[in-house]
Amino acid sequence: MHKYGFAIYYGDDLKQDFNFGKQMKQAVFLIQSPDRKGLVSGITTFFYRNGFNILHCQQYTDTCEGEYYMRVRLDLSDMELTRKQLEDDFSAFATEYGFRYSVYYLDQPQRVAVLVSKTSHCLYDLLTLNQEGELPCEIPLIISNHPDLEHVADKFRVPFFCCPIVNGDKASQEAQILELLERHLIDLVVLARYMQVLSNGFTERYPRRIINIHHAFLPAFQGGNPYQRAWERGVKMIGATAHYATAELDEGPIIEQDVERITHEADPAELKHIGSGIEKRVLTRAVRAHLEHRIITTGRRTVVFSR
């Protein structure tokens, strides 16, 4: 994190300029600022004066908090500046206007690790969509605390690593997982029904880069076995929530949610079946939003721009 409060993210080859085709020479800027007059004009003028074409621009003003949010996707094909020059110039500009920002270059896909336990539906969905080109990322490994889903990884030809908790030593197991994540240069961790609570130290290593799917419409039915508890309460709709994982269980910023209506005729098994479908689509939407750099986190909330 820069002293002025912004972060710069690259692909695998950090801090290098890439010579890819024009179609990949794009960048996304995410901007957050106290709302003020002239802000939009100042930002767009900066890009115009430096010869950038704005391909897509979205903005939102939170009138309750007085905050302004913007997502800008730029064409870098005709950029005469180096990336370092662009970053230095925009840093000075951001300091002058007093806003925070991050910039992402699109010429390298993010590297995603999927953590699972014994349930396969979310894993299958992510791998299938990735294989079909619907999720713009690389998945170099799958990690589990059980061996049950190794056959799924084999089917998609993704390396599988089993990291069990031996004699209750969860700290050693997490250290093993973290070593794998570092070795494979992982940008995003997806908890696809990984049924272990991560330690504070783990989540702090990947702030806003761990996405969890919770099989309930948070904040209702936090923790385990939500479908049984939902049935016991006689709920008339069930849902799922994807959120960034933090030190507090199921309390991280919410990215995506969905629900379906049910009736008294649905038993716990039927609720679980319906819920599995909701979980898949909610997790996929959240992961896609992160990969496409459409999320700005603000406190315990998120601003998620549409596609």
Can you annotate each of these PLM segments?
Residues 137-148:
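Short internal beta-strands
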Residues 1-23:
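N-terminal amphipathic/basic-hydrophobic helices that include classical n-h-c signal peptides
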Residues 121-132:
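Histidine-anchored nucleotide/phosphate-binding helix
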Residues 112-121:
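Short, glycine-rich nucleotide/cofactor-binding loops
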Residues 20-110:
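A conserved regulatory-domain signal marking ACT and ACT-like small-molecule sensing domains
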Residues 154, 158-184:
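Adenosine-nucleotide cofactor-binding segment
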Residues 109-113, 209:
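Residues that mark the start of a beta-strand
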Residues 146, 169-175, 184-307:
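Donor/substrate-binding cores of folate-linked one-carbon enzymes
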